[in-house]
Design a protein with these regions (language model features):
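P-loop NTP-binding module
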Residues: 1-176
Length: 176
C-alpha cells in the first residue's frame, strides 16, 4: 500500500479537520452517527455518494464523510468510481499514474488491489483511485471483477465510501 501526503491547497475543499467551522464539522459528525446507527446491524458497510447534476459537491461529501468516519477509529476506504471525471487523486495528491480501480478490474487479479490502495497521511483513510480512465466506464463497472473488488474491500474495511458520477448524466451509479 502506498502513502500520499495531504495537499494544503485543497484543504479548503476538505475541511473536517483543522480550522473548519464548528457547524460544518458537527454536521458531518451527525451524519456519521446516523450512519453508524443504521449500520449497527452490520448491513450498511458500503455508502454510495452521488448527485443529480455535476458540481453539487458529491466528492466533497464523500471525502469529508470518509475522514469523519475514520476519525472515530473506523477503517475506511474511499473509492473513486467517477470514471468520467475522477478528481479524488488530484485533491488528495495521489499521482495520476498510480494504479486504481480500473487497473485492478482489467487485470482480473484480486491481488492487484493491495498495491492500488493508498493510505492518505494524517487523514486516517485509504483510497482506491479511479485509475486509467476507460472508454467504457459503465461496462467496466458492470464486470464481475468489480463485484469481487467490492467484496474484498467490505471484508478489509469497516466502511467503503464510493464517489460516483451524477445519476442524471450516466448510468454508472445505478450499475453499482
Amino acid at each position: 500500500m502506498s502513502k500520499a501526503s495531504k495537499n494544503t491547497s485543497h484543504r479548503k475543499l476538505f475541511t473536517v479537520g483543522g480550522d473548519a467551522p464548528f457547524q460544518f464539522v458537527e454536521a458531518y459528525k451527525s451524519l456519521r452517527t446516523n450512519l453508524e446507527f443504521l449500520s449497527s446491524a452490520g448491513n450498511c458497510k458500503t455508502i454510495l455518494i452521488t448527485s443529480s447534476v455535476p458540481e453539487e459537491g458529491k466528492t466533497n461529501v464523500a471525502v469529508n464523510l470518509a475522514m469523519t468516519i475514520a476519525a472515530s477509529g473506523k477503517r475506511v476506504v474511499l473509492v473513486d468510481c467517477d470514471l468520467r471525471k475522477a478528481t479524488i487523486s488530484r485533491y488528495l495528491r495521489i499521482p495520476r499514474s498510480h494504479a486504481g480501480l480500473t487497473n485492478v478490474i482489467t487485470s482480473k487479479d484480486e491481488g492487484a488491489l493491495a498495491t492500488a490502495l493508498v493510505r492518505v497521511k494524517d487523514s486516517g483513510i485509504t483510497v482506491l483511485t479511479a485509475g486509467t480512465i476507460p472508454p467504457n466506464p459503465t461496462e467496466l463497472l458492470s464486470a464481475p471483477m468489480t463485484e469481487k473488488i467490492f467484496a474484498s474491500l467490505q471484508k478489509a474495511f469497516d466502511y467503503v465510501i464510493v464517489d460516483t458520477p451524477p445519476v442524471s448524466l450516466v448510468t454508472d451509479a445505478a450499475v453499482l
